[in-house]
From Swiss-Prot:
CDD domains: fungal_TF_MHR (cd12148), GAL4 (cd00067). Residues 113-231, 426-445 are annotated as: Disordered. GO terms for cellular component: nucleus. Transcription factor; part of the gene cluster 29 that mediates the biosynthesis of dihydroxynaphthalene (DHN)-melanin, a bluish-green pigment forming a dark layer in the conidial wall that protects the conidia from UV radiations. It comes from Zymoseptoria tritici (strain CBS 115943 / IPO323) (Speckled leaf blotch fungus). Transmembrane segments: none annotated. This is Transcription factor MYCGRDRAFT_87993.
Length: 978
């Protein structure tokens, strides 16, 4: 017995192992000389030649070539007589030995008798006993539900109907007459057969095989151990050349032992149009169509159309997406479960909450919908996005995305199938079959899944590069090459990474098909990533694994799926611990130049390796900051942990050659006295050292030039300090409300508690001064450099952190949920003061967040941008509650309990820069009436709650629609309705 070194599967014969190893190595040594398709086995190549009608020597293959169709996707085995005598059988029918001895040649079933008990045996008679007949089939118009019922029950006799002759249906016989030639057209192609409309409709819409028992009693797969995905185990899963797989109805491919006769198989709707471009089909020469597991080849003229270019052929279908309701069954079951679980979110809770036990589970639903959409091959071929290039790229692609090789897509497909199989097994525990194998799909569709076409995958990778890579720049040389990832690293780890890239890119596409792909891939990769780490703990420190974990955490945290969001928050601590234990957070101790004779290419390669490590480390810091900010918790990382150098300038990271990197390095790290900095090992400061210089206000005197990424990382410790002091202040109740409800107010005396509250406010004011120092550094950078997406994100985060210093957002959400609110006047005063201690400062930061978010292209915004609008909406809504009461319960003279509005000019708080005179006057003298700008350019006041929330909903509608943004929009709409 021999074993596979890749997967450990055992084999009894060496040739079986040799053939199995080809499935791991992806080596296909046999190539067709006509269409240049590659094959892993010689017999598959010989079978493929029958499609062309010529062999490798360009000799015509006779119609009677002795080959019989495969059964259940297997090569035919010896007949019963040869098997009993253990003699070699040529596998013809009848075989030469039986014909020579005048024996009855009987084909054996390809499955064991124990597993074939419920299957209808297919015993073929000898050639002399099977005449060629021309049959007439009665076709009756039935609905889809009736056909589905017939497929799941025993066959019944059809009612009498008008017989429609559809041409000769040839039974299997060793003597098959050659097809009649068609009249040649001018272009050299055969003329397709003509069908009348009525005949064609009946021919396409009815199941001609309903009388076969094998179709109504599909058996289970023969896999015992479940080591291979079920998608690769039955006849219907063998891939066909492009165009063939959509022509055969899926309900005819349920029985693996049903022999394939193309002349008796009804074609799927719209398949007749394909006949004119497939001479083999038009001529009936389809004796053996099954091809090895190979990506369908696509003409370059179609690929070069691209997605998102200015080609008129593309723009004619720009706003057409594949019909998800018709082509993807049960697509409407996705959103109700997602929406029902939104009230159970652990963050963004402005509506009454639900316990997690009451929320519907969505993991299994995501996987099943992924399986359904991957079966919809025709839908993905015709899929196109609904928006323009400017929305996707934001003025230009961030990275160059290399075209996917065919071998890369094949490898990715095979591994993805195993991921999906494992994930489905995980979530179907207790519902599977007794022997661990899968039964056919209940809907009657084929179990054969395919990744979307290469052009669609490249489009998703392009979307990923323009959205994710702008904020987490982890790809060097300005080039994203999935082929290199798949062939230069661990297969499973690299596949998880590439699939998560595709899922991340698809998440930004406003398409139901893309959402289904994203949700299922994220869940499948999560399970496989966790399994990969469990099986080999050494992989926990692998950069590819940590990169994949980063992608999963970001994608799941902002997915809009309650369960994926919770898992991301729960598992981030595990991934943070993996990062700590790998030792990469500490500064490297090896010598900077151990080999003085290194070439420029070697220096560049070493620098890229070190820079990749730094960027991966500090990308986790940014993820920690984002999750902590929007969940109102303290970051898990401490600034003192980071001794590794920070990422260097993006100009160096995006250099495409060693010479370009060398010249840029000389300018970025310029040494005095004319010495070359290349090869010196010069690296930026660590975050710990940079923050120390920032506290000492030494960055400008020391001439330290900051990059947008370094400015972003500098906000992490500032956010930690704001969170710490804000949480401490929330433990103190405002004196006004305490005094108003105190029984003995005169007994209130200074105490250690008051001293602690005062000192905490002083410390918080110091942090606000540090935030202003950071803002000065950012403005200094913007005076010398153009505004980029990362810098816009930095400014949004700055205003969000500043909002946390002047508001109590958890209390605002409690007020929105009406928790412990009795509606009294004194409580409203107390709640407003407790939620927003500094109204003018809070309104200013809210307006700036509006301005920055709306100035960003909708397709390249950070994944949490809708969460920023959510926080702004609730703060302005809370402040408008007091304005509303002031308008209804005070006198025109303003002598009521609420102060009268401050006099001054009205101004758009979301359209003016921070240094504008009106904003400065509003912040310093508290003069002016802030407004927001509507879509039509008019200004709207902030005095009424409902218009404020509606305006925030409109701002969300301006951006890209995702599951997360749609959920935030729904929450704000529910709040506006009260």
């Amino acid at each position: 017995m021999v074993f596979c070194t890749y997967c450990g599967q055992s084999f009894t014969r060496d040739e079986h192992l040799e053939r199995h190893i080809l499935t791991h190595t992806n080596v296909k040594p046999f190539k067709c000389f006509t269409c240049h398709m590659s094959f892993a086995r010689r017999d598959l190549l010989q079978r493929h030649y029958t499609v062309h009608g010529r062999d490798q020597n360009q000799n015509e293959i006779p119609a009677v070539n002795g080959m019989i169709p495969k059964s259940a996707g297997r090569t035919p085995i010896a007949c019963s007589n040869c098997a009993k005598t253990k003699t070699k059988c040529d596998k013809k029918f009848p075989c030469s030995r039986c014909a020579g001895r005048n024996l009855r040649c009987t084909l054996r079933p390809t499955r064991r008798a124990s597993k074939n008990a419920n299957r209808v045996g297919a015993t073929l008679e000898s050639a002399t006993d099977v005449p060629t007949e021309v049959t007439t089939v009665n076709v009756e118009a039935t609905s889809k539900d009736t056909r589905a019922q017939e497929n799941s029950s025993s066959p019944s006799s059809q009612k009498s109907g008008t017989p429609i002759s559809i041409g000769p249906i040839m039974e299997e016989t060793p003597d098959i007459a050659p097809p009649q030639p068609f009249t040649e057209q001018v272009n050299g192609g055969p003329t397709p057969p003509e069908f009348s409309p009525d005949l064609q409709e009946s021919f396409m819409d009815h199941n001609l095989m309903s009388g076969f028992p094998g179709l109504t009693n599909p058996s289970k797969d023969s896999s015992d151990d479940g080591s291979s995905p079920r998608f690769l185990l039955d006849w219907s899963q063998m891939q066909m050349p492009l165009g063939y797989d959509n022509m055969i109805q899926s309900d005819l491919m349920l029985d693996p032992e049903l022999s394939f006769d193309p002349n008796s198989v009804p074609l799927a709707p719209h398949a007749d149009g394909i006949l004119s471009i497939m001479p083999e089909l038009a001529n009936g020469g389809m004796e053996s169509l099954i091809t090895p597991f190979e990506t369908p080849k696509m003409s370059r003229s179609f690929v070069e159309l691209g997605l998102g270019n200015s080609n008129p052929a593309f723009h004619s279908h720009r706003h057409q997406s594949m019909p998800s309701v018709q082509s993807i069954p049960n697509s409407g079951n996705e959103m109700p479960a997602m929406i029902a679980a939104q009230d159970g979110w652990s963050a963004f809770r402005c509506t009454p909450t639900l316990p997690s036990s009451s929320c519907p589970k969505t993991a299994k639903l995501n996987l099943e919908q992924l399986e359904e959409t991957l079966r919809n091959h025709e839908g993905w071929v015709s899929w196109s996005p609904r928006w323009e290039d400017n929305d996707l790229a934001g003025g230009g692609d961030h990275l160059t995305v290399m075209q996917l090789h065919e071998s890369t897509r094949d490898k990715l497909l095979a591994i993805m199938q195993s991921f999906l199989h494992k994930a489905l097994e995980t979530h179907r525990e207790g519902r599977g079959t007794s022997n661990g194998s899968h039964s056919p799909n209940p809907s009657g569709a084929s179990n054969f899944v395919l990744l979307p076409p290469g052009r669609v995958l490249e489009y998703f990778l392009r979307s990923y590069s323009n959205s994710f890579e702008r904020y987490f720049p982890l790809t060097s040389r300005s080039t994203l090459d999935a082929n290199e990832l798949m062939h230069c690293y661990n297969d499973r780890a690299a596949s998880i990474l590439v699939l998560l890239m595709i899922a991340q890119g698809a998440a930004n596409i406003p398409s139901p098909e893309a959402r289904m792909l994203t949700g299922g891939l994220t869940e499948a990769c999560r399970i496989s990533l966790f399994d990969l780490i469990e099986r080999n703990i050494i992989m926990s420190g692998d950069p590819i694994v940590l990169h994949s974990a980063l992608l999963f955490t970001v994608q799941a945290a902002w997915s809009g799926d309650k369960w994926q969001m919770d898992i991301a928050m729960g598992q981030r601590g595990m991934y943070f611990a993996m990062l700590r234990h790998s030792g990469v957070l500490d500064r490297s101790s090896h010598a900077a130049s151990a080999q003085p004779q290194r070439t420029l290419e070697q220096l560049w390669t070493d620098w890229i390796q070190n820079e990749s490590r730094s960027r991966l480390i500090y990308s986790w810091v940014m993820v920690d900051q984002d999750l902590a900010l929007f969940h109102d918790t303290a970051p898990l990382f401490s600034v003192t942990e980071f001794g590794a150098p920070m990422p260097d300038a993006d100009r160096l990271w995006h250099a495409k050659s060693a010479e370009q990197w060398s010249s840029t390095f000389e300018r970025v790290h310029e040494f005095s006295s004319g010495f070359s900095s290349v090869g010196s090992g010069a690296r930026p400061l660590s975050l710990r050292d940079l923050f120390r210089h920032f506290l000492d206000d030494d960055l400008i005197p020391m001439g330290i030039e900051m990059t947008p990424l370094q400015l972003r990382l500098l906000l992490h410790p500032l956010q930690s300090m704001v969170c710490q002091f804000s949480q401490l202040l929330s433990c103190f109740a405002p004196a006004t409300y305490r005094t108003s409800i105190s029984v003995h107010p005169n007994q209130a005396q200074p105490s250690s508690r008051n001293i602690s509250q005062s000192s905490t406010r002083t410390r918080l004011a110091e942090v606000q001064a540090l935030l202003q120092r950071w803002f000065d550094l950012a403005e200094r950078y913007l005076k010398a450099n153009p505004l980029c997406a990362l810098m816009q994100t930095n400014l949004i985060l700055f205003h969000l952190i500043s909002l946390n210093a002047v508001t109590n957002f958890p209390e605002i959400e409690r007020l929105a949920r009406r928790e412990n609110v009795d509606g009294t006047y004194h409580q409203l005063l107390w709640l407003h003061k407790r939620c927003i201690p500094d109204v003018e400062e809070a309104v200013f930061h809210c307006g700036q967040i509006f301005r920055l978010v709306r100035s960003m292209p909708r397709g390249v915004r950070p994944p949490w941008w809708a969460g920023a609008i959510y926080r702004v909406a609730l703060i302005l809504w809370t402040d408008s509650l007091t304005h509303k009461d002031a308008l209804t319960s005070t006198s025109p003279q303003g002598n009521g309990m609420f102060p009268s509005p401050i006099a001054g000019p009205s101004f758009a708080i979301d359209a003016l820069p921070p240094d504008h005179a009106l904003i400065v006057r509003y912040l310093t003298k508290r003069e002016g009436v802030p407004c927001v700008t509507k879509l039509d350019g008019s200004q709207m006041g902030l005095e009424r709650a409902y218009p404020v929330l509606r305006h925030c909903v409109e701002v969300i509608d301006e951006g890209c629609s995702t599951r997360f943004s749609d959920a935030i929009r729904g929450k704000l709409e529910r709040l506006s309705r009260g």
